[in-house]
């Protein structure tokens, strides 16, 4: 009887014993990872990115514009272009190449936690992704409004700016509504783009049609 009693106690103690330290460590590490990263949709599928990274490099002017409006400071981006509303962002950021040719040495010195690319800049995605976490947030020009909103939502999630993104979306929706109202009964319209001495017209299948 004593042998049976002590054997039964041993079984009960084994069953009730806490999980091994190694398992606890793995579990804690998994929880820490999930607390500091998140999964977001990109033009190349879902990607795991750091939450609210402090050092960000951007090779996409649309994303740079959106981040600026969200109130996110971008530490590194391309050489400046002549876009007035982006000048403050260019002035504050380190230059890490151009939209088409990243300066990998400068980027390495900056040591970003996240690289954001898109559009023409996404051609360098594969090389950029070899060195650090990189996401491609190219906007679909065939559905620019919806795609642009998704890009903004993704960036807002990464940087914890959901409230500001909701404000911006409301402003955009209001502008669309005002434009539709102003165009009522005015017949057909034509969208022109003037770049230097070049004038371009955009039709119903262009990026502006959406």
Question: In which residue ranges do the predicted regions lie?
Answer:
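Proline-aspartate-enriched helix->loop->beta-strand connector
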Residues: 111-117
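Bacterial Sec-exported substrate-binding components of ABC uptake systems
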Residues: 3-7, 15-59, 163-192
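A short, structured surface patch at a secondary-structure boundary
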Residues: 55, 60-109
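Extracytoplasmic substrate-binding proteins
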Residues: 131-197
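Alpha-helical, coiled-coil/dimerization segments enriched in small aliphatic residues
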Residues: 81-86, 202-210
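Short, acidic/turn-prone active-site loops that include or flank metal/cofactor-
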Residues: 79-83, 121-122, 138-143
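N-terminal hydrophobic signal/anchor transmembrane helix of membrane proteins
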Residues: 52-72, 145, 150-152, 169, ...
